[in-house]
Amino acid sequence: MPPVMSLRALICVVLIAAAPAAAAPFVPESDSQVLERLPFSSGDPGLRRLRGLNDQLTRTPNDLPLAILVAQGYAELGRTTGDPRYAGYAQAALAPWWGLDRAPQEVLVLRAALRQRMHQFDLALTDLATVLNTNPRNVQARLMRATVQQVQGAYDEAKQECRALQDLTQELVWTACLANVNGVTGELRQSYEQLLSVFARYPVAEPKLRSWVLTSLAEMATRAGMMTAAEAHFRAALALDAADFYLLGAYADYLLDDGRPPEVLALLRDKVAADPLLLRYALALQAAQHSQELPARVEQLRDRFAASRLRGDRVHLREEARFTLHLLNAPQEALKLAQENWQVQKEPADIRILLEAALAANDATAVGIATDWLRNCRLEDMQLSRLMPAAKHQG
């Protein structure tokens, strides 16, 4: 088992990588611009400390340990808040090494995490390969490579990386890694039960690790239709990390699918700065028939996605496809977005919006692509199962 600080660093980097970015990162032109734009709260000691570290880094920009600390701090803020600027601030902290092919390993791992956040998956894999070619026992790089490969649908490769972790880190970490992959390739119930059993043996694990595992358990339970168990896992995870916007989005999706839009509105009312959370808030308004507020939120989302397109940012294609299908009722355009997104990432939510849009657009070819994928990877998902009768009819 790695020492506590190493495990914390591992969890930090992996969670940073796993969290979706809210938009293309803002990369400041100077350190003064960073300080000028950051929404620091004077009452938050953690943010005050980070600002102090950034001040110090401005004076000693080539201090690698300090730069890593500052970059991790910014990246963690981006993960929990969904503010896209923080990824840019993290990149700025690493500026002396960012463009180097052979940067220090700590930089390569963190750069890979940030690139994954920006959906630059191939670049992230290149960085991780460089690290692992030099140090095959780098746990952060192996776990992150498994995560990227799973997102891309390279499941055999992801499983290989997870198995390689068995001799490198604690059982809970590698079990969660393997359960996440097996859980989308035909072994959902077994993976859930195995991870739940191992998790019970780590009651005092690091809180961020527990939150990550609980979120995985919640998503697996949701796909399996075990709604009571999913609810318990989501609530336990939120008790540990109530500010994590990925977790908030996953729980909001669970509540929407469970027909509980008023709870989504209460959950996200003051958290709509992040585009994915604003989308779920608007979907809840629609489901709850809040006709007065909904038009303004739809226009807000329309403006945000338009601005993203102008920047060349296509990180949130999945969310834009959901918006276009469910809030604009434009299935043909939604299908184009879902297909573009499918070229980049292949998670359960991606195949779901692809199939939903294909069915709404009456596109038998696209329906066939989605159902072939589901059959080949053996993905089990209650919501997708409900779509299959219509898919078989169209296919």
Task: State where each predicted segment sits.
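Canonical positions in the second alpha-helix
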Residues: 56, 96-97, 130-131, 164-165, ...
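Short coil turns that delineate tetratricopeptide repeat
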Residues: 61, 102, 136, 169-170, ...
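Canonical tetratricopeptide repeat
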Residues: 69, 110, 144, 177-178, ...
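Residue-level recognition of tetratricopeptide repeat
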Residues: 72, 76-79, 113, 147, ...
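Structural motif corresponding to the intra-repeat A-B loop/turn of tetratricopeptide repeats
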Residues: 77, 81-84, 118, 152, ...
